[in-house]
């Protein structure tokens, strides 16, 4: 069985252990029939099966590939939050958690102890979709804001999955095809020059060491 949790791929090896894979910034899994495989640069792990290989390729080496037993697996994910695409979200609980914090909304979306699976690209796009500013403090949000936020996060994630993800630099699917969600970005890595024909301008700032793209006029 192969499943996903947060940004991890989990492969059940048997009833008591799993393989944990994180693609990092540039990692990808590749599948080859044995007769077709030729080792490429940055092929760090090769798993052999009867008729094919699964290869983990990672140029920038930010990925992870390791094995855990069931007890270790529970402990490893114990501090992770809710999965926006799988778990039922209790709006009241999220609102209460946000009211106790005074961090920026963008920072909260990247905090994997609150929600899992959102990276920088999708946090930027989701906030634009619901027209909420990344600079807003979490304790300033009301119930309606939370509802809009959750809906937008789910929308952006589902749309990205439908379009094969975002292939900006290195990402490819296991069959080698590129994702196309990057062509649908509204704000991420968009410059003022690109957006001159639009009715809004995108501003870039740095929050907690990460690039944030947003429209100051549309996102409040």
Segments and roles (model prediction):
Residues 1-65, 159, 187-197, 203-204, ...:
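A cross-family signal for N-terminal binding/gating loops and helix N-caps
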Residues 4-5, 12-14, 80-82, 169-172:
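Short low-complexity stretches enriched in small and charged residues
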Residues 10, 97-220:
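Basic, nucleic-acid-binding surfaces and adjacent catalytic neighborhoods in DNA/RNA-processing proteins
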Residues 19-117, 122-129, 137, 144:
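Phosphate/anion-contacting hairpin/loop surfaces
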């Amino acid at each position: 069985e192969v499943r996903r949790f947060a940004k991890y791929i989990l492969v059940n090896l048997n009833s008591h252990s799993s393989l944990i894979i994180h693609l990092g910034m540039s990692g990808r899994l590749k599948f080859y029939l044995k007769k077709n495989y030729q080792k490429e640069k940055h092929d760090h792990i090769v798993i052999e099966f009867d008729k094919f290989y699964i290869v983990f390729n990672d140029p920038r080496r930010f990925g992870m590939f390791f094995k855990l037993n069931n007890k270790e697996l529970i402990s490893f994910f114990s501090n992770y939050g809710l999965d926006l695409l799988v778990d039922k979200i209790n709006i009241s609980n999220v609102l209460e958690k946000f009211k106790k914090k005074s961090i920026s909304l963008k920072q909260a979306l990247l905090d994997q102890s609150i929600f899992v699976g959102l990276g920088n690209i999708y946090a930027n796009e989701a906030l634009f979709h619901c027209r909420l500013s990344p600079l807003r403090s979490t304790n300033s949000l009301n119930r309606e804001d939370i509802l809009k936020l959750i809906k937008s996060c789910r929308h952006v994630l589902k749309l990205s999955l439908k379009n094969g993800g975002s292939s900006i630099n290195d990402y490819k699917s296991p069959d080698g095809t590129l994702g196309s969600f990057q062509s649908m970005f509204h704000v991420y890595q968009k410059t003022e020059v690109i957006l001159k024909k639009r009715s809004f301008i995108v501003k870039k700032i740095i929050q907690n060491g990460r690039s944030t793209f947003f429209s100051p006029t549309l996102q409040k």
